């Protein structure tokens, strides 16, 4: 799995109430990326994304824009290691 990568993303800005999580789930599914996305109580969106480097890089670039109604101001990115994950899912707010 050396060509695979796992990243934790924290997305800041107007990213809740704009279909960010569902849009990210659809984009991740289209790219073949595994993981999850959830709202955070502080108003950010958090995601753990895993898959081939190029696909994760494409999803990370998408996260900087988000869906049409989002206004992303920053994305914190951390490389992580994690066991293989299944399909991409929306999780409850944490």
Model-identified regions with their sequence ranges:
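Intrinsically disordered, low-complexity, mixed-charge
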Residues: 1-94
């Amino acid at each position: 799995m050396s060509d695979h990568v796992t990243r934790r993303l924290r997305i800041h800005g107007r990213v809740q109430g704009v279909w960010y999580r569902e849009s990210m789930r659809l984009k991740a599914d289209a790219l073949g990326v595994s993981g999850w996305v959830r709202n955070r109580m502080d108003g950010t969106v958090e995601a753990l994304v895993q898959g081939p480097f190029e696909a994760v890089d494409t999803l990370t670039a998408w996260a900087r824009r988000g869906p049409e109604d989002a206004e992303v101001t920053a994305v914190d990115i951390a490389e992580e290691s994690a066991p293989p994950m299944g399909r991409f899912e929306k999780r409850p707010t944490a």
